[in-house]
Amino acid sequence: MKTIELDDDLYFYIASQTRHIGESASDILRRLLEQPANQAAPVTEPVTTAQPHTVADAMGLEALLDSGELQKEEKSINRFMQVLSTLYRDDPVGFTQATEIKGRKRVYFSRDPDALRASGSTTKPKPVPETPFWVITNTNTSRKQNMVAQLMTSMGYGDEVIARVCGAI
């Protein structure tokens, strides 16, 4: 596997073309370029590689937890929104892929608030700050914690960090 450096706009375009959780960048590009999965790529000269875009350190999330900002916030909905916004900033592609999670009867995340309203009359969709996503908000704190835990698990965060974040909501 090779790593390439992309401009942000191209990176976000590729991420927006994700169809399901776990779809790799290679799968997305093959689909967009209409290339079969087993076709061998031509051998080219190696290029300078950039660091792959991964959750790895989750610097923004750690900074949010360490700053005490979440503890200062009185309302769980505001803490929930801060966490979601930070997760998106840390890893937009992983967040986009992970937003495919759904409840038994409801869609939790969407780029379209009407899609959330269609999954239930009392979902109260709100925009996630600094992201193109909307999230249902008419849920209890436990459900919000569960949504964040599912989202973070899909994004590749470890159990310890997930527990720490959910405990702060």
Swiss-Prot record:
Organism the protein comes from: Aeromonas hydrophila subsp. hydrophila (strain ATCC 7966 / DSM 30187 / BCRC 13018 / CCUG 14551 / JCM 1027 / KCTC 2358 / NCIMB 9240 / NCTC 8049)
Encoding gene (name): seqA
Name this protein carries in UniProt: Negative modulator of initiation of replication
Keyword vocabulary terms for this entry: Cytoplasm, DNA replication inhibitor, DNA-binding
Family recorded in the similarity comment: Belongs to the SeqA family.
A GO biological process held by the record: regulation of DNA-templated transcription
InterPro entries the record matches: Arc_rbn_hlx_hlx, Ribbon_hlx_hlx, SeqA, SeqA_DNA-bd_C, SeqA_DNA-bd_C_sf, SeqA_N
Main location, first listed in the record: cytoplasm
Positions of disulphide bridges: none
Family annotation (SUPFAM superfamilies): Replication modulator SeqA, C-terminal DNA-binding domain (SSF82808), Ribbon-helix-helix (SSF47598)
Signal peptide region: none
One GO CC term on file: cytoplasm
Subunit organization: Homodimer. Polymerizes to form helical filaments.
One protein family per Pfam: SeqA
Keyword Heme in annotation: no
Purpose of the protein: Negative regulator of replication initiation, which contributes to regulation of DNA replication and ensures that replication initiation occurs exactly once per chromosome per cell cycle. Binds to pairs of hemimethylated GATC sequences in the oriC region, thus preventing assembly of replication proteins and re-initiation at newly replicated origins. Repression is relieved when the region becomes fully methylated.
Lineage: Bacteria, Pseudomonadati, Pseudomonadota, Gammaproteobacteria, Aeromonadales
GO MF assignments: DNA binding
Places the protein is found: Cytoplasm
